[in-house]
């Protein structure tokens, strides 16, 4: 028994079916079937854990609010206290290219509501949930906040985001870097041929818009694949590759293309067929006068064929040495990718 049979003879899904949700950039259901019995639970659980814990994303690390020394303060004219504001800031969804850290600023006067859409971003930082409410200002109130944004993975508690040399007034924020918000999966029986107990894995995924659900699963699968490589302690035997020797031709390989593959009108195609013109090599050797002597073949059909040939860099009245070759049907099959 060859070692490849350990994995080559297991059934695998033909493709991943993606069912978009109301917002395809955030919601989707992915279905993989058929899987060997037990593999649905194995893969579903592993992918779910990776999706929630290991994908890279961006989040707010800390915030500085003008006039505020610590998170247990209150701000005149602002209805929420600083603790509630910080909790709202934690929910800001961000997409960012590069590592960071980068800065964002919001400055607003009341009355009104400060939302994530009021934040002034720079460069490649994008706020994904602009409708998120951060705080509410009374008439005459003013607030200015500066955010530090960085990239990371998983969840990082606020205390770990506090630098050792943190200046007074810098408030660390819990950072939820993962772009995946929710993942659920279920495993059902599915049929393949006469076998009824294969697995069908259905995963429902919600992201913050920083990555599509389909891409999130692809990244998670790649992480899992990379982690498993260390357990493979052998190299697969290499397959012998036989290279087909293609003979040199004395003419353009395009001459081996059949005329019925050209986009011709029915009338023109029938005229060529009735005149036993099968290949382009047969056609280009004909002169205009010869073509016009073909029954039911008129000037309109002639112009059509001349135009099609011109698009291929060919014309009527060409000399084709060595035409027709003895094994023309075999050559046409071997050269079909060369014209």
From Swiss-Prot:
Keywords from the named record: DNA-directed RNA polymerase, Nucleotidyltransferase, Transcription, Transferase
Pfam families reported in the protein's UniProt record: RNA_pol_A_bac, RNA_pol_A_CTD, RNA_pol_L
Enzyme Commission number(s) of this protein: 2.7.7.6
Stored SUPFAM superfamilies: C-terminal domain of RNA polymerase alpha subunit, Insert subdomain of RNA polymerase alpha subunit, RBP11-like subunits of RNA polymerase
Task of the protein: DNA-dependent RNA polymerase catalyzes the transcription of DNA into RNA using the four ribonucleoside triphosphates as substrates.
Entry's family note: Belongs to the RNA polymerase alpha chain family.
Subunit-structure text: Homodimer. The RNAP catalytic core consists of 2 alpha, 1 beta, 1 beta' and 1 omega subunit. When a sigma factor is associated with the core the holoenzyme is formed, which can initiate transcription.
Designated name of the protein: DNA-directed RNA polymerase subunit alpha
Organism: Nitrobacter winogradskyi (strain ATCC 25391 / DSM 10237 / CIP 104748 / NCIMB 11846 / Nb-255)
């Amino acid at each position: 028994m060859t070692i490849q049979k350990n994995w080559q003879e297991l059934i695998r899904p033909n493709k991943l079916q993606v069912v978009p949700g109301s917002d395809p950039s955030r919601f989707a259901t992915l279905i993989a079937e058929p899987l060997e019995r037990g593999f649905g639970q194995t893969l579903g659980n592993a992918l779910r854990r990776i999706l929630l814990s290991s994908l890279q994303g961006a989040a707010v690390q800390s915030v500085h609010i003008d006039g505020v020394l610590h998170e247990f303060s209150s701000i005149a004219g602002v209805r929420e206290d600083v603790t509630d504001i910080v909790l709202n800031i934690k929910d800001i969804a961000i997409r960012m290219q590069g590592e960071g850290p980068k800065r964002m600023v919001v400055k607003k006067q009341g009355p009104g509501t400060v939302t994530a859409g009021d934040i002034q971003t720079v460069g490649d930082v994008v706020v994904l949930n602009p409708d998120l409410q951060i705080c509410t200002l009374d008439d005459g109130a003013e607030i200015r906040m500066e955010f530090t944004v960085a990239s990371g993975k998983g969840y990082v508690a606020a205390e770990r985001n506090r630098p050792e040399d943190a200046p007074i007034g810098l408030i660390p924020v819990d950072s939820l870097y993962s772009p995946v918000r929710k993942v659920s999966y279920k495993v059902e029986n599915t049929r393949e041929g006469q076998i009824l107990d294969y697995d069908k894995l259905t995963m429902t995924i919600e992201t913050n818009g920083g990555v599509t659900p389909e891409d999130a699963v692809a990244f998670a699968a790649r992480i899992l694949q990379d982690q498993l490589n260390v357990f493979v302690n052998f190299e697969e035997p290499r397959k012998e590759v036989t290279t087909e020797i293609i003979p040199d031709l004395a003419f353009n390989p395009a001459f081996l293309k059949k005329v019925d593959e050209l986009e011709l009108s029915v009338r023109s195609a029938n005229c060529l067929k009735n005149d036993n013109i099968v290949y382009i090599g047969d056609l280009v050797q004909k002169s205009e006068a010869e073509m016009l002597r073909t029954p039911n073949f008129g000037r309109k059909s002639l112009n059509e064929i001349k135009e099609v040939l011109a698009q291929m860099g060919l014309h009527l009245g060409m000399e084709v040495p060595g035409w027709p070759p003895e094994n023309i049907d075999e050559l046409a099959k071997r050269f079909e990718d060369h014209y």
